[in-house]
Amino acid sequence: MSLLKSIPKVDKFIMNEAFEGLSRTLITKIAKKTLEELRNDILNNKIEKIDENTLINEVLDSYKDLTSPSLKSLINATGIIVHTNLGRSLLDEKSLTKAIKIATTYNNLEYDLKKGKRGERYEHITKSLQALTSCEDAIVVNNNASAVFLILNTFCKNKEVIVSRGELVEIGGSFRVPEVMNQSGAKLKEIGTTNKTHLRDYENAICEKTSMLMKVHKSNYSIEGFSSEVSFEVIVKIAQQNNLIDYFDMGSGHIIDLPYNLNKDEPSILDIMKYKPSLLSFSGDKLFGSVQAGIIIGKKELIAKIKKNQLLRMLRVDKITLALLEETLNSYLKNELDSIPTLKMLNTKIETLEQRANNLKEKCENFIKCEVIKTSTMVGGGTTPNKKIPTIALTLEHKNYKPNKLEEILRKNSIISRIENDKVLLDFRTILESDCKKIEEILKNLFESTK
């Protein structure tokens, strides 16, 4: 009981000079919680004495943890360009500057400057998407999963959607196409087998309950060997013959030809649009190289129906997303592809990567063992699962640390690396030019005195 009486009073405790200049409201909340935990520890015989300095430090640590940004800038040295866990596609600084201007001023998000009345937010990207893809109309929601859900809910509620069994995919975060269909109200009708789906499977499955023929791009895995599938071009023709909607969930979408024969595994938006599809959707922040968004393009009358769905308001994008997406679209239209970081990384020549790696090696080899090697990496983001692309990496070895420990040390200092052949690798496919100096300084601070 005497120990309980020794617990500091909150009002007196928060007056300590260590808390000067800090938010009194937040310090009070943290102090109350800390002192309550102390009381419980005393009652459970976990504490024998009270150290007020320890309590003060606990409160200060909690305050710092709460008020420090959780999202932190990192150096991606994994080589994975569209790294799902590290924020997917990077954005161009110039685009961000323009978006900041939009965010910090009033703007015409939903205001028609010509007519002087309410406008539509999607008009800011529609013309650009029409010019870029030759679509009739377009709309954007907050990600491609939302796009899939919205399309199915708009056109297929209580109706059948025909999908090949081999395309009922699961992507990151346990996002499963069949479950999304169920949540949308659509009724899944599986056809074919895991490895083979034929034209006759589609034709035999169509009935009066059918609303849509859907194709899902197998972005994060592939079926090889004894297998076959029906092309989307053929699916479009079948749908048109039966007065049905055809829809292609492309997952990751891209506009330009990709290096290293990546087009073989990733269909081009422009190629698909040649078939004049009813609808297709794709992610904005994968190979398209923009902000997170679900981009839907297709027939004007179908997009108009999507716009009338009440769910659209729940899934709509904000002014920042639209401003950033508009900048990316302008980069495509102007053929300024170097201003799209994802494409720039993909297209950087191996000689350039090698030069950067050698430059860093020369500056760091005095305090850590390193070697420039040729290796390979992957695009990431659930795209091109079987394709590896050439890259250059700097291997790191230290006599005091095993690879796992060295990787951990780097990670705690904002460098995310990978381990290959029992060595830590810094992959220059994703290391920005501006990162090189930062890496040099970090390695020097960590290892100069321990080599």
From Swiss-Prot:
Species this protein is from: Aliarcobacter butzleri (strain RM4018)
Sections of the chain in a coiled coil: none
What broad taxonomic lineage does this protein's source fall under?
Bacteria, Pseudomonadati, Campylobacterota, Epsilonproteobacteria, Campylobacterales
What does the record give as the function of this protein?
Converts seryl-tRNA(Sec) to selenocysteinyl-tRNA(Sec) required for selenoprotein biosynthesis.
Q: Which family does it belong to?
A: Belongs to the SelA family.
Question: Which one of the record's GO molecular function terms can you name?
Answer: L-seryl-tRNA(Sec) selenium transferase activity
State which Enzyme Commission number(s) the record gives.
2.9.1.1
Q: What GO CC annotations are associated with the protein?
A: cytoplasm
The protein's annotated catalytic reaction(s) are: L-seryl-tRNA(Sec) + selenophosphate + H(+) = L-selenocysteinyl-tRNA(Sec) + phosphate
For this entry, the protein name equals L-seryl-tRNA(Sec) selenium transferase
Swiss-Prot/TrEMBL cofactor(s): pyridoxal 5'-phosphate
- Pfam families attached here? SelA
